[in-house]
């Protein structure tokens, strides 16, 4: 499985967690036949471990209208923030992948919002 496919699985797991909290990541990965995917395991584990910081970073960068993001968009943004701040994935790679996920899984122009929000977070932090 290539990195794009792995990242897509991580996005799906973050989305799943937003609906029903993941209690046992090993069990979930086994059920999905993802136990050999180290990047998926590392990424979702990092997200679950750092959720409060990731959520704070996102929420503090949203205006009142944007606080009502869909779970899909929020999951994409969580994925990218986790990668940039807790996994040392290059900013440009993470934002580009988030935009691509938004184009695939969200409404037509939502990718622009994803790009704008992530760009704002990165500029604010000087990353």
Model-predicted regions and their roles:
Residues 1-104, 108-111, 115-127:
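N-terminal interaction/assembly modules
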